[in-house]
Amino acid sequence: MKKLTFLLVIVAASAFILAFRTLPAENKYGTNVGDKAIELAFSTPDGKTLALSSLKGKVVLIDFWASWCGPCRMENPNVVSAYKKYKDEKFKNGKGFTVFGVSLDRDKDAWMKAIERDGLEWTSHVSDLGGWQSRPAAIYGVNSIPTNWLIDGNGIIVGRNLRGPALDAALDQIIEKK
């Protein structure tokens, strides 16, 4: 009898575990395509806190970069071009496109000058001025820049590391066709 009870407990526990393992990962936060984007809330150049979630409803490119990063600065014209082209577009899951720029700078003046020189005209710029030890980089597991995540209006990651024409192509795929 004890063996039968033990066996039933094992079977029931296994069924319970399997049932929950196969449930869809709805609202799972992470950094992979299909995950809900992890919240970021850090200081803007004027010292206010800006949360990624404040942009909900828009398609957002979370763009990790720095003023001292040559490849980042070379990519900035592509990001600016995409911003200008898509900022007022309607998407399947979002209205408008913007950039949430996350700087890995340590020097605020260098960060501000790069924003101005590169014409990064969107208003969502954040940094904790922690460089490679910055909290946003740790949260997203950033170990090289430039790197980015594209999220839809519901905060779901729909693309990653989209540079050059790949960003336009990804935005074209999720734009609402007229």
Predicted features, each with a name:
Residues 1-28, 178:
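Bacterial Sec-dependent N-terminal signal peptides
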Residues 22-53, 176-177:
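N-terminal "domain-start" segment that seeds a small globular fold
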Residues 43, 100, 105-107, 112-149, ...:
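Short, internal strand/loop/helix patches
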Residues 56-57, 64-85:
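Conserved redox-active cysteine motifs that mediate thiol-disulfide chemistry
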Residues 59-60, 97, 146:
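Alpha/beta-hydrolase fold active-site loops
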Residues 76, 80-83, 108, 112, ...:
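Extracytoplasmic/secreted envelope proteins and their assembly/folding machinery
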Residues 89-95:
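Intrinsically disordered, low-complexity Ser/Thr- and acidic-rich flexible linkers and loops
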Residues 144-178:
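Thiol-/selenol-based redox modules, centered on thioredoxin-like
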